[in-house]
Amino acid sequence: MIYKSYFLENNINSLNEKITLFYGENLGLKNDLKGKIIYNNKNSEILRFTQEELTKNNRALINEIQNISLFEKSKIFFIENVNDKLLDLIQETESIISDRKIFLFADILDKKSKLRSYMEKSKNCACVPCYE
């Protein structure tokens, strides 16, 4: 599913997919959307990763998804600087993620990008292009 960024600026809660990819050159828009996600999920535990951290230890994300917290209702994951190298891990997590959400943030991804293509076609994933 592909969402228009201007639609989400006022309706960020309409993101129902488990995994959402924000990509493009408009860093300010991506940061605004990230802020709205955080604001609307105040009771959730927010965990942040970079792609570099996850490529060094790809079990870190899987372990955090499978950990059940007694104190927090849900978990939200932000993964920064993603590209095609993370596709295998995303596919693996898509099958085990339940009430958690993953938000991926990338720079410019061209149409040939495997990650972008997968996210656009998957039923559990969404894409949000962030261009000016």
Where are these regions (language model features)?
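Non-catalytic interfacial helical region
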Residues: 1-20, 25-132
